[in-house]
């Protein structure tokens, strides 16, 4: 269990025993939001060379900030809740002490001693077979944290009668310790509260937030490691090829009963048809551009493949299989969690998988001009210093996204998008932007995965084409 969480538990016990509020000042939120996000919409769309009507309808190689605010102010729970709390996004997790069972036993006993019913302990650990050697350590955050859905009070105890010791705003994050039963709030139909912790002026603070006002987020390291094992098993037989149909260069596959999406959630555009038999009259599903495949055999213009992460085997027309730019060695993996809006980056160092970076990310959302970031196992296909994007519904270049690595169709992992400024009819580059407040909150891109620009730059330099895979989990 993290030393930080153990300290917070003992501080909580002392405060409950004394029945006094902690002598803390209200926590001031560092609510610096990126100027680009406050004053303009981010429009991200890769420039498409082929601007035929079909391409514009089918391609969706697009990135644009949707029309909703991530930091919309909600009414506080109490009239006096006007102060905000200090930004805790950079709280680091370093000291590990004990395991999950020890953590639950200690917290459960101490909470019970004070009349609190423990529902759940949050104590995510790095899997034992993974070492940690961070090569990028900015914006570190607790492995378990809350994303606030509304403005909320932080209270001394899980009751509305308890002292308010701080406030936190919507779309901010807070390290998470446990879930307990507290006051039942009729309007929400809920009696669940989250115990949170933070560091203020070198002192560990702890308090409670009503659960309906927040969403639990976690780093699913266990699931990330399992996905690496799946990929390793597929790569054990030799290099992995990938599906190649960027911008439908090899032809758009047929529709499925008149539909452009299959039952697995993959789209027709920039995919290949995966047939059950080596003929075009056979039933098929879509396999997206960039998806890694194991080549099994060839027959009559078809290639039989085992798609990494898919059940069964499929026949794909030869023209959609790229074996020249293959995953020759599996040494580096970027894993994005679509559910939690975060990611982990792993490298094989001296035969040992090592976590070298973890942090927040933003994935795509379905919309008129946008798509969810597709699940699956992909090739890191190419790197670009930047790519240009259109304003939605036009062929007007709106800006660029820096330090981009393409993994599927028009989907890249990249830094914060930059909108050009227009002066005297000319595009002016205002310079790269490091930070975007919405990163790691809700899905809002058009398929791409947004990172803080310094992390995108790190990945761009670190990733080797032919040795790096890109995985999207949920």
Segments and roles (model prediction):
Residues 3-24:
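Sec-dependent N-terminal signal peptides of Gram-positive bacterial secreted proteins and lipoproteins
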Residues 23-54, 63-71, 96-153, 166-170, ...:
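SH3-family beta-barrel domains
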Residues 24-35, 46, 50, 105-109, ...:
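Exported/periplasmic cell-wall-interacting domains
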Residues 108-110, 115-117, 168-212, 285-319:
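SH3/SH3-like beta-barrel superfamily modules
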Residues 150-159, 270-278, 446-453:
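Short, structured beta-strand/loop micro-motifs enriched in basic residues and often containing a Trp
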Residues 157-173, 276-289:
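SH3/SH3-like (including bacterial SH3b) beta-barrel domains
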Residues 166-167, 286, 360, 372, ...:
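Residue-level "contact hotspot" at macromolecular interaction interfaces
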Residues 318-428:
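Gly/Pro-biased beta-strand-loop elements
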